[in-house]
Structures are given as C-alpha cells and as structure tokens.
C-alpha cells in the first residue's frame, strides 16, 4: 500500500467514520477482499491497529436489503469478538444511500441491538477512498 493510500484510509476512518483512535493504531493497516456469508455479499475487510474491524460493502438499493446487512453485521460482530478487536464498523456504500438507509438500519439493529461497539455507516460510494474501492487484495502497512 502506498503512503497516499494509507493517508486517505486514515483520513476516511478518522473524518468520515469518526474514529478517535490514537495515532499509533494507524501504524498497522490491513486491507483485503473477503468472501461474505454468500457470494452476493462481497466486502472489503479493513483492520486498523489490530483494534478496529471495518467491513465495506458496496451495493445498489435493489440489492441492499435488511437481510444482507444483517448477515454482514453478524459476520463482523462474530469476527470482532473472536479476534478481540475493540470495535466493528459496517460501511454500506451506494450511489443512492438515502434509498437504502431505512432497510440498512433495520437489518443492522435487528442483529446489533444495543451493542455500543458496533456501528453502521451508510455512505455515498464517492465518499470511499479509491484504495477501498480498488479490489486489491492482501495490502498491508
């Protein structure tokens, strides 16, 4: 991963997602494409400082159902707990984020409930840094 990608990812995580992690957490960034609970739900997996787990799922409203978000939320929370990460963030990105916000929130809340260490972010696709949309695999810092 080049320094520009590292900086854009850190800026995205801090500014867009609101992460307040200390600087040293960003010394380790692992980025990879991973299979999701089924082939229709691919996502990018991002681990920051072995503390923060982020799944990024790009979709369009017709495909963004509460069931899809529920599956990704379950998978992410399970991984967070198994690997002892502090937080899990699910980013659902679409060209039409307002059209899927309600279904995404319903699917997320049905699984995460009051889990204060799990967060949903529904964003416009153009808010994602290029490094998170590239599809490159096994990129590490």
Annotate each PLM feature.
Residues 1-52:
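N-terminal, charge-rich interaction modules
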Residues 4-12, 35-44, 78-91, 136-141:
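A short, terminal or domain-edge coil/loop segment
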Residues 14-18, 22, 31, 74, ...:
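Generic surface-pattern signal
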Residues 17-22, 51-59, 84-88, 130:
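Generic detector of short, locally flexible boundary/turn motifs and exposed helical patches
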Residues 27-28, 48-70:
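Acidic/glycine-enriched edge-of-secondary-structure segments
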Residues 57, 93, 121-125:
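Conserved beta-strand termini and adjacent loop/short-helix elements that scaffold enzyme active sites
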Residues 59-112:
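Amphipathic protein-protein interaction modules
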Residues 107-141:
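Long, charge-dense
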């Amino acid at each position: 991963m080049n320094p520009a990608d590292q900086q854009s990812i850190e800026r995205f995580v801090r500014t867009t997602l609101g992460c307040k992690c200390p600087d040293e957490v960003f010394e380790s960034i692992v980025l990879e494409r991973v299979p999701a609970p089924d082939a229709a739900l691919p996502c990018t997996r991002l681990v920051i400082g072995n503390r923060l787990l982020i799944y990024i799922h790009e979709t369009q409203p017709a495909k963004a159902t509460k069931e899809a978000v529920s599956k990704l939320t379950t998978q992410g929370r399970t991984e967070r707990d198994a690997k002892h990460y502090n937080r899990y963030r699910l980013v659902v990105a679409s060209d039409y984020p307002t059209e899927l916000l309600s279904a995404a929130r319903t699917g997320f809340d049905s699984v995460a409930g009051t889990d204060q260490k799990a967060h949903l972010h529904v964003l416009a696709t153009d808010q994602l840094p290029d490094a998170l949309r590239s599809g490159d695999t096994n990129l590490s810092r």
